[in-house]
Design a protein with these regions (language model features):
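Enzymes that bind and transform nitrogen-containing heteroaromatic metabolites
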Residues: 1-185
Length: 185
C-alpha cells in the first residue's frame, strides 16, 4: 500500500498565505530546494486542490519555472498529477488527471496500487478535507520563522484532529519541519 502525505508551509502563527494570498514570505534556499527535490523523488503521484494546481501549473512548465530550479521543475513536470476540483473542467498541465466527483474513493483506490508515495504539496483545503477520512498517513508541516498576523489559516475548516509527532528537522534558514501522523478514531 502506498503512503499518502501532505506537505505544507506555514508561518509561525499558523497561516499558509498572507491576506493577498502571496507566498513571498516562504523561507526557501538551497537546503530547502534539496529537501523539496528529495521529497518529489519519493512521489509516484502528486495531488493538488484546484487553487494550488493553478499556481503550480502556471509556473513549473514555463521557462521561468524551469530556470528557477531545473531539477525540481523536471520532477514536477514528469510526475503524474491529479487535481481534485468540482469546478475545473480540464487540466492543461501535461500528465494531469482531473477528479471532480468521488475523490475520497479514487484516492483510496490509488493508495492500494503499488508504487511510490502520493504527495500533496500545498493544498491546505484539500488536506483539511482528507484529515477525517483516514487516508492521510503523514503531515509534513514546515514552519517558517515569520509572523504574518493575518491571512489564510493552515487548517481552516478542519475538524479537530490529534497528531503524533514522528520527527523534526531543523534547517539553517530557521525553518523547522514537523512530521506528524494524524490519529483517526
Amino acid at each position: 500500500m502506498r503512503k499518502m502525505l501532505s506537505f505544507m508551509m506555514t508561518s509561525a502563527d499558523g497561516y499558509h498565505a498572507d491576506p493577498g494570498d502571496a507566498l513571498d514570505w516562504h523561507n526557501v534556499d538551497q537546503e530547502f530546494s534539496q529537501f523539496a527535490l528529495a521529497q518529489l523523488r519519493e512521489a509516484g503521484t502528486l495531488v493538488f486542490g484546484r487553487v494550488t494546481y493553478e499556481g503550480m501549473a502556471a509556473f513549473w512548465p514555463t521557462p521561468a519555472g524551469q530556470q528557477s530550479d531545473p531539477d525540481v521543475a523536471k520532477a514536477m513536470n514528469t510526475t503524474p498529477k491529479i487535481v481534485i476540483s468540482r469546478t475545473l473542467a480540464q487540466a492543461t498541465w501535461v500528465g494531469t488527471q482531473v477528479i471532480s466527483t468521488g475523490a475520497e474513493q479514487e484516492l483510496a483506490k490509488l493508495k492500494q496500487q503499488p508504487g511510490k508515495d502520493i504527495v500533496i504539496p500545498g493544498s491546505s483545503t484539500l488536506t483539511a478535507s482528507l484529515l477525517p477520512t483516514g487516508l492521510l498517513d503523514e503531515l509534513r508541516i514546515m514552519v517558517n520563522p515569520v509572523i504574518l498576523g493575518q491571512g489564510r489559516s493552515l487548517f481552516a475548516g478542519a475538524d479537530m484532529t490529534s497528531l503524533k509527532l514522528l520527527k523534526t528537522q531543523q534547517f539553517t534558514s530557521g525553518n523547522v519541519l514537523l512530521y506528524y501522523q494524524p490519529i483517526t478514531n
